[in-house]
Amino acid sequence: MTSAVDGLKQRFMAMSQPDADGVYRNGAAKRKARTGLAMGNLTQLWNEACEAVSFDVPATGIGLGAVGSLARGQVGPSSDLDLAVIYEPHALTDQQLNELANKLWYPIWDSGLDLDQSVRTVAQCEAVTDRDLPAAMGWLDVVPIAGDTGLIESTAVSILERWRKAARKRLPELLGSAKSRLDEFGRMAYINQPDIKEARGGLRDSVLVSALAASWLADRPHGTYDDAVERLLDVRDCIHLVAGKDTNMLLSPYQAKVAAMLGLADPTLPDGEREAKSIDDLQTLLARVGRQIAFSLDSTASRAEHSLTHDKPRFAFFQVFQPRGGGKRQAPTFDVIAPGVAKHEEEIVLAPGAEPAADSNLVLRVAVAAAEYGLPIAPGTLRNLKKCPIGDRNWTDESRELFIRLLASGPALLNVWEDIDFIDVPGKLIPEWLGVRNRPSASAAHRYTIDRHMVEVVTRLGRETPSGGRYDDRHYEALLLAGILHDIG
């Protein structure tokens, strides 16, 4: 017996094909079209299921909702469907619920589509999102498909309200989940075969940005951030098309074909050279969008944490009647730790009076402070440091000393280097760095890109010699410089 979802998987693939020249274009429009097709077919499937069961399905008290990428309008060519039947207690018996669910799920499975399904009461939906952070992230975007759409909408509102009330307590858990994923999957910008969903700067981070914005603790970024997310979704779509399945792993066998679909293959180059360069360009694209998404998460999280530190009424209107300290706002305190550099609320910031545009070494002093104190650079500070007049021909005794101190900071160097690389500092100090930046390694044994490999090497260089002695200052400086430059040229 045919169903509304028969052939849906094939239609997803057919409507997702690249243009005649092999380039995948208009990704956002294609995602919208796939989502619309899925929602329409699922509405029909609900009607078919209601007609096929041995009882009358009530018009109220039960409905079908979309969760995850389907709810966000981000369906890929091979994405699974994340669906939930939501019902009120006593709307149907357990036996009736099971019969209705089978009439929904089996046609989807038979069509070849992957399915993540659940059947829950409103209270169970709320309970799951209260205790399960990954589930909460997906359920913040619940949208109705069919049945009692009002019930689905009210459930979505309830989940969102509960998230906002609990967000202050759950913020550390949310940020901790991002740290755990970073430890497990690494940074997308530096991985030769990244998981573009779970790696730092991947699609999962964009979901966290939306969750932080939904909490009302911080506004979400727009503009270049939205462009980065859409471009990464284009990459995901191309992976689906090349792999022919639902995967977020950009494996080596896929990379040249994905790069070509993204329009990165230069037709004027010989085949071998064209393929190698397109893979390099693909890695550069991933690094750019991944850094933008990661920076957006960091800056949104920083604003959210700041709002927790400065808990005050949401609207200034109320402050008229509840003035603080005699109506005067307390001035922020800065612990100045280097010229132009200060600690403020567990972040490294610019000290009052600092002038980035007139201080070429300020960015290195900030980087050294962040590494040696083990504190992050405030996102606003990082943006201001773009004004520093950095060059490769104006090295001074101070800049050389600061650079060596930064290289000698051990594992703390990794995050700090990523921060300053986001604003192109290494390439301005060492132009040759741009030749290896974001480039994948030719060796399958290497997990990281060439630039990340060199930074990793430096973090492991201590003062102890292979024979058990200790390097003096001059030899240790030479070792650190050799480490950060050893693959250049």
Where are these regions (language model features)?
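Active-site nucleotide-donor binding segment shared across nucleotidyl transfer reactions
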Residues: R25, A29-K30, M39-D94, N98
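Conserved catalytic core of two-metal-ion nucleotidyltransferases
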Residues: G36-T43, A49, D56, Q95-G150
